[in-house]
Amino acid sequence: MLKRPWHIVAVTDVVASSGWYTTLLEAQQNHPGARVFNQISDSDGTVLLCLHWWGPSGPHGDHDWPSLSQKQKRHAACGVLLWFVVDDFDAAWERAQKMGATIHEVPNTNNGTGMRSFVVQDPDGYFVAVNEIREVAAPNNL
């Protein structure tokens, strides 16, 4: 059985944050223009991240989870690091610079993976790490 997490973070402006993530990750939106909830997905449809407006949601406004509706009680970035692995690291770094992202760490290999990564902040203050994909060696078929 296939299981995948759908990470949801609360944001101030779903439309603006959707644009920010789709640009950085060269991804697509599942609900373009949505103001309460959107999904950022890869070209194969895999959901990478869900964005939820800071506030209650649902058809009747009864989805009122404190972690998504009480912004005043905690800082958005507290306890969260969004980590993405990309197949074209250099292009992602170039996009981050072109879009004027706040850079927290320039590309380095001091992240515990031995692979290059950089860290930027999104418009809501979340730290976003972008890591190059690790090439897996082919098994020895002797």
Task: Enumerate the language-model features and the residues they cover.
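N-terminal amphipathic/basic helix or basic patch
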Residues: L2, V9-A16
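Conserved active-site tyrosine of GNAT-family acetyltransferases
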Residues: S17-T22, A96, G125
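Ligand-binding pocket scaffold of soluble enzyme catalytic domains
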Residues: A129
